[in-house]
Amino acid sequence: FAPELIDSVMEEIVGMEQPYRYRNKAQFPVGRDREGRTVTGFYAGRTHTIIPNRNCLLGMPMNEKILETVLSFMEKYRIEPYDEKTNRGVVRHVLTRYGHTTKEWMVCLVINRTKLPYADALVEELVKLEGMTSISININQKNTNVILGEKVETLWGSLYITDYIHLRTGADWQVEGDGIAYRISPQSFYQVNPIQTEKLYSTALAYAGLTGEESVWDLYCGIGTISLFLAQRAKQVYGVEIVPQAIADAKENAKLNGITNAEFFVGKAEDICGRAARIIK
């Protein structure tokens, strides 16, 4: 397209005033450096070499304290980091999640075993951190690049943290209403930038121009974040997702908010839509 055409139809990008310290989720690989020390951080580009880093400026400052706690625990009890070349070792990743509005914290260790040795000692230290709500392990014993396995076991607290997404209106993005609450597990898909998510969803809702008479389909709905947000203005919302646990979470999120005009289906979008449409008729 010609640049002048693009300029004529493109609206101004809605940016962030402070584009730092916003990520509500982080996943840190655990391994050894060249000197054999246990480290965590991020992979160098196109490699599986970990660059030690405990304090990414996009993440929350609390991540550093969590990682220090985990690494100190591993050193004290001689818990081995995972070695992907040999498929040996225990701790593969440290996953953290944060509720932007609730200030709740989740820590989940991805491990190469069915049990974490000395787990009680780790819990004893992590619960000292402000806002700690959920401590769990995720079991992944496969030789794979996929971070999370299928099974999660709670070590302390709840399996979930809770967060809210608020409707924002006007040029200054004023909050309207109490927001929609969401339960978030280690495996849940949830937008990582809570500030921009509210702007994005509110803009989508405004563009939809819902009057309260429409039926809306949300394909690949995950835990129902967009579905339940749109349910505030739609007559009926239908969500479709292939992951059963995500749909279970979506239904629980609807109950959590007292939303009765949202229905969720498990299956492929291409299979569900036609069949569900006939049923709804």
Regions found by a protein language model. Give the residues of each.
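SAM-dependent transferase fold signal centered on methyltransferase-like domains
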Residues: 1-162, 167-180, 202, 206-213
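Rossmann-like S-adenosyl-L-methionine
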Residues: 118-120, 124-281
